């Protein structure tokens, strides 16, 4: 059996938090029609409850992302790896900022745009993260 290490903990926390952040958004998107059918307040109640979990996951992503950078030493990676990292960091910022706008939205347009941008940027960050993790070192 492979050894259990701090790298295992770091990656477990990072991947689990990403699953909560992005997977939760996908789940709420899928449940939205059902929630709307239950009552006009049901989507808001579900979103408020998810917010606590989601933002906690985002903090874990941020902290473990920094931990990942310290473990990988980007300075020793090639240009393509660092460009991919830069794009991932932009997507992480975009998903967080868009989610904040979504959470504080007072109009349907901002609510929809914030949710859509947050989800797409989150999915892009996951894809870019997989590219970084699977790149030859």
Task: Identify what each model region corresponds to.
Residues 1-137:
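Polytopic transmembrane helical bundles with strong interfacial aromatic enrichment
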């Amino acid at each position: 059996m492979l050894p259990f290490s701090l790298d295992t903990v770091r990656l477990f926390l990072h991947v689990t938090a990403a699953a909560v952040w992005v997977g939760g958004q996908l789940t709420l998107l899928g449940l939205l029609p059902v929630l709307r059918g239950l009552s006009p307040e049901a989507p808001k109640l579900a979103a408020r409850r998810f917010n606590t979990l989601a933002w906690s996951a985002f903090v874990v992503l941020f902290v473990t992302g920094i931990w990942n950078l310290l473990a990988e030493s980007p300075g020793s990676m090639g240009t393509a790896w660092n460009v991919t990292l830069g794009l991932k960091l932009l997507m992480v910022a975009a998903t967080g900022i868009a989610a904040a706008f979504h959470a504080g939205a007072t109009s349907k347009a901002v609510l929809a745009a914030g949710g859509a941008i947050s989800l797409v940027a989150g999915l892009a960050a996951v894809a870019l993260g997989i590219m970084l993790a699977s790149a030859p070192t």
